[in-house]
């Protein structure tokens, strides 16, 4: 995968790399917008958000740390996660394809 400079960065909390379209999920009302392979981008997660992890290729949250809900559940599902990525909801465009690197803690745009 070829990539450019990170769009956002944060705490690497679940290792691996995944590519997919950004899905901005701000409230439970947005849950139905998630599709398999989407990159879940949100402020934070709690147990009510757990079903979304089955669909997500990766998770990016604006808050949290290594022991946050998003980090723990992402590791359980073995999907990459970057938490504490300040500004992710405003910097990442809904539907834009990104590469999430949960080992480095970066989210980059994809080049052709």
Language-model regions, residue ranges each:
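Non-catalytic, soluble scaffold/interaction modules
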Residues: 1-112
């Amino acid at each position: 995968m070829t990539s450019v400079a990170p769009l956002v960065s944060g705490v690497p909390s679940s290792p691996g790399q995944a590519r997919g379209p950004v899905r901005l999920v701000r409230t439970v009302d947005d849950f139905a917008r998630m599709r398999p392979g989407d990159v879940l981008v949100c402020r934070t997660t709690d147990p009510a958000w757990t079903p979304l992890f089955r669909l997500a290729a990766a998770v990016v949250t604006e808050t949290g740390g290594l022991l946050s809900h998003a980090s723990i559940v992402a590791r359980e599902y073995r999907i990459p996660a970057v938490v504490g990525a300040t500004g992710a909801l405003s910097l990442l465009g809904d539907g834009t394809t990104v590469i999430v690197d949960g080992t480095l803690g970066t989210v980059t745009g994809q080049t052709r």
